[in-house]
Regions:
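Bacterial N-terminal signal peptides
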Residues: 4-14
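Beta-propeller-forming repeat regions
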Residues: 17-484
Length: 484
């Protein structure tokens, strides 16, 4: 029973279709009226559009992972025009997903592109029919990811050009390049933006050779995963540029030229309207500019690596030429099946001492969550997941600039995996965690059987000199238990 439950939870995402493996089913919340974070599987590529043509914006989200590949439709129930945060219906799979799917809105119609192709009549064809846009779709040689293509009338001449953001990985060289002080010795990620100018028309397009776009006299280069969005963010009538990145932030390039002759100023890392850095909770972010709330300015609908999607609302204000956005707020859906970010690592235990088995789980973001079993026997009713705290703070382990062997580009991942045991033999459940760092940590339960409370982490030490992987740049001491 416990083994099957683990498999089902790891597989769970927020849609109610059975797993295509004999005997396995996703765990349902069995909790009508419960709202949870809207989400798909690993990697969310939001395609906001009026999917069902009922006059409001729905969320269509592409999820290119396995085993839950698909494009999922989250219906906006239409409970009030201008409602920024409707509780979406549970997802319906409406087609197959590929990587790099991006939406463009042309003359009021949603058009979906992936690198080099347009997906034709996608409502009818389940995103399965494509049209090649140019003979050579490979705009940059070498190690590339995040080849993000969109339509935009770049130069205001009335036809749709193509812009493409491309992430380049050739300088990063991926792994094991820290010096003894934990400083990365290889290069960074790059995120470039290219233009394919349409010298024809929309009915008979003819795309010119690629142009690499510049800002402030230098090539536009963000930290990978550029997701370029051209829109009038500052309300002056021309198209500015806003990019995402492989980490969690945004870069803004003001158009200091004109609508027909764009020229971009130096990129500025964005802050929110409160003066703090404008960042998502996780990374590998995929922003799409759209007037989500119908107030006349361009908001951002942004996907995270763990399948969640957030709204970053434009306040309508511009400060020093930079649009002012509110911090992200994550959308919610009607609860369907249990999900905890991506790559969930569930452990079944009676955490709250009430006689039934709950679920404690880690995930890619480095959190540890508690799903409380509210009863129901063989078909339990589950509460919304709660992130655990330790030492009075939300328990979250992240790599930071040097905790992942695979480079600083994994700074916001934690990959928490765990067990629950009475480590100190005091009759209470403690938490034992491994993570992206490879150090085994003990979180002592200093609460009670019915109300667990975790102390701050302590390293686990064993007698004798412990072996340490040769590729570690850091040293936690001779006795500290480390892995990997």
């Amino acid at each position: 029973m416990r083994f099957l439950l683990v498999i089902a939870i790891v597989a769970a995402i927020g849609v109610s279709r059975p797993v295509s493996a004999a005997g396995l089913e996703r765990l349902n919340y069995n909790n009508p009226g419960l709202n949870v974070d809207l989400g798909v599987g690993l990697w969310a590529w939001p395609l906001p559009m009026d999917w069902d043509k009922d006059g409001d914006l729905d969320l269509v989200v592409a999820c290119p992972d396995k085993p839950y590949n698909g494009v999922y439709f989250f219906e906006n129930p239409g409970n009030g025009k201008g409602n920024k945060f409707p509780v979406f219906k549970a997802a319906k799979r409406v087609g197959k997903a590929g990587h790099n799917m991006q939406v463009s809105h042309v003359d009021g119609e949603a058009r979906v592109l992936r690198d080099g192709y347009e997906l034709i009549d996608f409502r009818k064809n389940g995103f399965g029919k494509t049209k090649k846009l140019v003979p050579n779709t490979k705009l940059l040689e070498g190690k590339t990811r995040a080849r993000m293509w969109r339509y935009v009338d770049y130069d205001g001449d009335g036809d749709q050009d193509i812009v493409a953001g491309i992430g380049y990985w050739g300088d990063l060289e991926w792994d094991h390049a820290y010096d003894a002080q934990g400083v990365w010795q290889n290069g960074p990620l790059h995120g470039y933006v290219y233009l394919l100018r349409n010298a024809g028309s929309d009915t008979k397009p003819f795309y010119m050779e690629k142009e690499q776009l510049k800002a402030g006299g230098s090539v536009i280069d963000v930290y990978g995963w550029p997701s370029p969005n051209f829109a009038d963010f500052d309300g002056d009538g021309d198209l500015d540029l806003l990019c995402g990145e492989f980490l969690d932030g945004f870069t803004y390039f003001e158009n200091v030229g004109s609508r027909k002759n764009p020229e971009y100023g130096n990129g500025r890392k964005m802050k929110n309207a409160h003066g703090d850095s404008l960042v998502m909770d996780l990374q590998m972010i995929t922003p799409t500019a759209i007037d989500w709330d119908g107030d006349g300015d361009q908001d951002l609908v942004v996907g995270d690596e763990d399948g969640r999607v957030a709204l970053i609302e434009h306040t309508g204000r511009v400060n020093g030429g930079v649009p002012q956005f509110l911090p992200p707020v994550y959308f919610e859906q009607e609860a369907s099946t249990l999900k905890y970010g991506a790559l969930a690592t569930p452990f079944c235990v009676d955490w709250d001492g009430d006689g039934d088995e709950d679920i404690i789980s880690g995930n890619t973001a480095g959190y540890v969550g508690f799903f409380e079993n509210l009863g129901g026997g063989e078909n339990p009713k589950w509460a919304r997941v709660v992130n655990l705290k330790a030492g009075g703070r939300t328990l979250r382990i992240m790599a930071g600039p040097n905790g992942s062997i695979q480079s600083p580009c994994e700074a916001k991942w934690g990959y928490t995996t765990l067990s629950v045991a009475d480590w100190d033999h005091d009759g209470l459940h403690d938490l034992i965690i491994n993570s992206i760092w490879g150090e085994i940590l003990w979180y002592r339960n200093v609460g009670t059987k019915g109300e667990p409370k975790l102390a701050a982490a302590e390293a686990i030490e064993l007698e004798g000199r412990m072996p340490k992987p040769k590729w570690f740049w850091w040293d936690g001491g001779e006795k500290q238990l480390v892995t990997q």
